[in-house]
């Protein structure tokens, strides 16, 4: 199909061949020049006539320079006494000889300029056949004539010297340099301007004009473009200025000394260079498109992740807002009840004090009145009065003092809110765990309810299992997780040496894992001492990349977090005795918290790779115990 598409249109090609390369229109009175190319008679005449004008300007400048030199010579001759004028008869004799030489074929004279000969249009007739033959054979006869002209010139000069003794007589001007006429298409040069009519081409153009009145706009000439200065086809390319030019621009002074090649050759060369860049550019484009598609997918994923995270944040804060509102309402209700009870007690105490004050006021008035009396009236029932006064006792009111553990205290509120928030956030994800005995190291002993583990007094005889840890004292939880959020709490106790966390299902159970280096193997003294020394130096036995475990633990002195990609020393403000472990499978996060204060301890960014993740526990020394909290 490509070959068919590249086949030229015969009609279009025929139209192109009938177009003049100068005027870009159908031939009008076509003529052929010596190289075989055809042009309109008017076009080629005007083109070569324009070249004559440039040559004529140059000749005029040369004549002016020669006239100036002659005037200087005459001035010198006059100063030397050589002022004898040239005789008219001698000059006329010279002119006659020059006319005779012109008739013999000399192309330059003193009376007629060369341009007048050049401007004459030559039409090949029968009598010019012999002269044309000489031209195509190399113009040999013309060279012979030039030799004869030189001999005649020498004879004329000798006669002038004999007849005229004036040494400053001006000599005839030297012959002007022969100019060449150039074909606008192939750039072939000719010594003179000559062309012949092409009648067959004129007839063909008439037929083509009847078929198509105007030249095709899709022709090569139209594709080449038009020179904006000379209105001619741009068929050449200047390699110096790197621009397309026409045949007239080629002869101008701005491009005459430049390297010029046909435009079609440059087009083909540049096409080849462009084709060489096509394949690398195509590969680069494919690579960029792949990267662009990858980045677009990444942007889409990031946007989706951002939306989901924003929704999760909004949901969590919504829960938090509702929780705080509920807690606020409950605390306010309890505070009102407490204050109402306190107000009741205070009111009752005030009533009792008012009644006591009234009794004291009456007794005081009676005592004052009796003290004013005398005689028998004073002594009447005096003992009863004394008894009543002595029986009076001051009863201070009950003073209410706020209890720091009551709900209205700041510390109580903070503690209550923190604890309830922790329960709120962990309640939905909290799981009830048990330990898997098939994974427990033989040196470990599990509690009957499978919620606690410690080091046994001696190595136990247990059946070998593919999942059992044999190189380190570790055990996994019985429940594994492949998605979702999960929370569990672990209580640790004892002197030192424990680790809690999570592990992928593909963990190497036969290799040593966890922070602090290797663990107790068989439990003998040498192994224990060797293990203790390694723990102290924090030298892991196996490469971290083989562990697939994320855990937080201690060797009794330092807390550290260790995974397949990091080993970080921790400095918690308090030594946690109860750890909360929070697993977010989709987010790839495993967080550790102080379950008592909810203080953050450490968070891992993990890659679970679609595997199940199990709770992980490790015991390093006797007296250390780990217990799962319900």
From Swiss-Prot:
Keywords: Coiled coil, Cytoplasm, Isopeptide bond, Metal-binding, Nucleus, Phosphoprotein, Transferase, Ubl conjugation, Ubl conjugation pathway, Zinc, Zinc-finger. Pathway: Protein modification; protein ubiquitination. The modification Phosphothreonine is found at residue 84. Residues 264-373 form a coiled coil. Auto-ubiquitinated. Zn(2+) binds at residues 227, 230, 249, 255. GO terms for molecular function: identical protein binding; ubiquitin protein ligase activity; zinc ion binding. It catalyses: S-ubiquitinyl-[E2 ubiquitin-conjugating enzyme]-L-cysteine + [acceptor protein]-L-lysine = [E2 ubiquitin-conjugating enzyme]-L-cysteine + N(6)-ubiquitinyl-[acceptor protein]-L-lysine. It comes from the Eukaryota. Changing residue 20 to A: Abolishes E3 ligase activity. Residues 51-86, 143-176, 503-538 are annotated as: Disordered. Its EC number is 2.3.2.27. A zinc finger (RING-type) spans 20-61. The keyword Cytoplasm applies. It is found in: Cytoplasm; Nucleus. A zinc finger (B box-type) spans 222-263. It is an enzyme of class 2 (transferase). There is a cross-link at residue 256 (Glycyl lysine isopeptide (Lys-Gly) (interchain with G-Cter in SUMO2)). Residues 413-630 form the B30.2/SPRY domain. One of its GO terms (cellular component) is nucleoplasm. Residues 51-74, 143-166 have a biased composition (Acidic residues). E3 ligase that plays essential roles in innate antiviral response. Directly binds to influenza A virus or vesicular stomatitis virus nucleoproteins and targets them for ubiquitination and proteasomal degradation, thereby limiting viral infections. Activates the innate antiviral response by catalyzing monoubiquitination of CGAS, thereby activating CGAS. Also involved in innate antiviral response by mediating 'Lys-63'-linked polyubiquitylation of BCL10 which in turn hubs NEMO for activation of NF-kappa-B and IRF3 pathways. Belongs to the TRIM/RBCC family. Interacts with PRKCA. Interacts with NOD2. Interacts with TRIM17; this interaction prevents TRIM41 activity on ZSCAN2. This is E3 ubiquitin-protein ligase TRIM41. It comes from Homo sapiens (Human).
